[in-house]
Each structure stands twice: as C-alpha cells, then as structure tokens.
Amino acid sequence: MSRTLPRALVPAVLATVLFACTPADAPIEAIDSVAVTFLNSGKVTPNTLPFSEAVRVGNMVYLSGQVGITPGSMTLVSGGMPAEAKQTMDNIRTSLEAHGLSLEDVVKCTVMLADMREWAAFNEIYKSYFTPPYPARSALGANGLALGARVEVECIAAARTPA
C-alpha cells in the first residue's frame, strides 16, 4: 500500500529536509556564494571561440570538450583515431596544467566517439594517460563532432587547493 503526502504539506517537508541537510556551522551566505571563475589560457583553443576553455566552481573545474587539434589552430591532426585521441588527451593535459591542475586531478570524463567501433582503440590510448584508480567515465557514440573529429573528451577535475 502506498501513501501520498497531502499537497499542502510538500513545501514544509522539503524545507525541513533541506534545512536538516545544511551543515550546522555553515552560514547560509556561504552556501549561496560559491566562487565561479571562467578560465581561458589560449594554449589549446583560440580565445575567440564562444565558450570558456574551463570554468572553476569552488574547487571543481569543468573543462570544455577537447578534440585532437594542433594547439593554437583549428586543424585536426592527421592520422585518424589514434593520432586524434593522443592529441585530444595531450590538449586536456595542457589545459589542466595551464590552470594549475594535472591529469591526477581528473574525477570524471565524458568520451564522445564518432564510431563506437573505435572504442577499444581509444581505450588503449586513454589508459596510457591515467593510472588506477581511473576517473569515472561515460562513453557514447556521437554524430557530427566539431571539425569532423573522431573523438571529443570533456573532463571534470577537483582542485586540491582553494581558488
């Protein structure tokens, strides 16, 4: 038998749960104010694109998707999936380092492949950039990646030092 909460009580119950989950020593202002910084080094992609290279929110850094372009250009490296995957991961490392981070700080990656049949080939290259324990990861097939790329990877990193 399932029971439902009367509609009039829902706001009160939600407010109680949210208040109960707030740390006792955290002032409300601190919860509402998190530093947000938009980061653009120009070391991988040109600063003229309509998105940030990365965004730092508190100690979390969200990297925009990277493809296998030669740094400072909008040209994919030649050599297909293996070359693009290597350059993509090199670009991620360069972007992280430009903002005081490393691949060891990465906690999540999202991998988009133009052809899921290249998943195993990508994994071989990916594994050479990380050591266990590996970041959490999702991989999906995607049609129409930027610049006709074979692979695009976006990452989330946790900074070990405050902003």
Where are the predicted features?
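Bacterial N-terminal signal peptides that target proteins for export
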Residues: 1-10
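N-terminal presequence-like segments and the immediate start of the first folded domain
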Residues: 10-13, 17-90, 94-99, 104-107, ...
